[in-house]
Amino acid sequence: MTFRRLLLAGAAAVFATFGVITLVQAQSAGRQPDAKHGAVIVAQGTAAGAPPCAQCHAFNGVSDASGAFPRLAGQSAYYLTKQLRDFASGERASAIMSPIAKALSRDDIADVSTYFVGVNAPFLPLKAPDAALVKHGEELAQVGSAERRIQNCDNCHGPGGAGEPPAIPYLAGQYAHYIAFTLQMWRQGFRKNSLNTMGVIANKLDDEEIAAVAAYYQQVQSTLETVESQAKD
């Protein structure tokens, strides 16, 4: 059995044991998530004081080209729910997101997550990164480094960073600045709200490698879209 299969099997077991319970607890008993109510929260915020998600992430979940805030459109509802609950509990630290998540009820979190997973938003046109940097990132993402015992990113995040829902997020088309920042948080021990796989891997990457992986994943989705559009012409 390959490492990827072993890891995904382990993740599936953890999800089966704890993930379903978390999702059930994240909303009122017997209630189905309401994407329309989620859209209202994204646009207007809540009476409890949570600001509109759209202020930073945009109504369609693409955020902005700066990469200061992640792209949320199409991300798995389970993953988004877990992150919001972790922000609220303090398991994932953020001076910005923690107070916002605390102002959201369990139903609010479920509704917002369900809204974003259903959004099919375009990818913003971004400046092309350095080709050599992207090539280096592609090698790390697809092959890794056997010599340094660095697993390739695609093992967990899927071919081309498409993600492995429900627990593992997509990276394809995510902003390079955000990916690099998140890897730095894992490396420095400031983020640890999941299995320590990411912390172990991030600690083996230097700054240039982090920048390379981030640059590769930022452009991989737009490249796929270009190929698809050319095929239709």
Ranges and model annotations:
Residues 1-5:
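N-terminal secretory signal peptides that target proteins for export/translocation
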Residues 9, 14-25:
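C-terminal segment of classical bacterial N-terminal signal peptides
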Residues 33-90:
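The feature marks the first
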Residues 55, 64-71, 86-129, 165-170, ...:
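Axial heme c-ligation environment in periplasmic c-type cytochrome domains
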